[in-house]
Amino acid sequence: LFENHKDELPKYEVILIDETQDYQENWIRIIMKYFASENAEIVAFADEKQNIYSRELDNEKMPRIPVQTGAWDRKLNKSYRLSQKIALLVTDFQKRFFADKYVVEQQIETNTMMSLFDEPYIEYHYYPLKESVKEDNAIATYIYQQIKEHRFHSNDVTILSSRIRMLRKLDYMLRTESKEKTNIMFETREEFMKLCPNAQTGFENNADILKIRKNRKANFWMNRGTIKLSTIHSFKGWESPVLFLVIEDNLKATK
């Protein structure tokens, strides 16, 4: 793709690569080969704790990238998005699930002003689910009721799950029962029923559904004034004032 046009491509003296933990090594090699000038400075930023695609790590449990000539600089260790309460939760989670996989921080430094004036409220709820059920009605109903009861502003709300089946049901409830506009990265319930009329589990997909998901993800916008629903892999939701996170029992701790 690039080789036949390499002389026409722009070359840059400085290249900044963010979220490097999501990159395959070959992608970075392409950037270096076709877009970097001869003496270009390439700076990569990565967070191994967000290695959701399970990219290979080096001997120090850090992202492996071809531009690296020395050890990773760990000076960027202060969070400007997490309050103290969330930071403590994140640290405990790392120690419980990531101790053998990553180098775990003993304490995350946070923004003091955020902790003073924007301390979050955290609740936990457990719902047993049956795989034979096509739609996760109990969870969808609970989240829908919470949004109505607390009168959350639509733009403040993000709902994340690894299970599109539940998100699809909740999106349908929000649109039909409360007339909410939503911002999603997957097919609607109506589209799913049309494209998979013989679905048995609610997890089925095909080329048409995958195309819809790709297009919706490309057009996803954080501040559209609507409730956002997404999978954990597509959107992390750190900036959302109100976040509903659905975690299934069958998720592997190493993922």
Model-found features: residue ranges?
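Conserved helicase motor core of SF1/SF2 NTP-dependent helicases
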Residues: 1-2, 14-255
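A short acidic, Gly/Pro-enriched loop at the edge of an enzyme's catalytic core
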Residues: 10-12
